Amino acid sequence: MSHDKKQNLQDVFLNSVRKTKTPLTIFLVNGVKLQGVVTWFDNFCVLLRRDGLSQLVYKHAISTIMPAAPVSLFEDDKADDDAAEESATD
């Protein structure tokens, strides 16, 4: 990710789980638990797909999102950190 274009963490996270099709558990503010894969999102809602069915979930109703697998964010920054560590040990 270039440093001149800032993205918010929410968009980076949702885009990462969308691209990798990582299964998620989403807890709503009323306690309902939803599970599925993010297929699309915008500023106000997330489209969650499970068993061939889609659910449109409004972001203001979401309390917590738990991915089923680790999510890698800011991969370019991680590569820069690794390179800096290698040169420091040389």
Swiss-Prot record:
CC annotations in GO: cytosol
InterPro entries registered for this protein in UniProt: Hfq, LSM_dom_sf, Sm
Domain of life (superkingdom): Bacteria
UniProt key word RNA-binding: yes
Segments forming domain Sm: 11-71
Alphabetized UniProt keyword annotations: RNA-binding, Stress response
Biological role: RNA chaperone that binds small regulatory RNA (sRNAs) and mRNAs to facilitate mRNA translational regulation in response to envelope stress, environmental stress and changes in metabolite concentrations. Also binds with high specificity to tRNAs.
Assembly mode: Homohexamer.
Name of the protein in its database record: RNA-binding protein Hfq
The organism of origin for this protein: Maricaulis maris (strain MCS10)
Gene this chain is encoded by: hfq
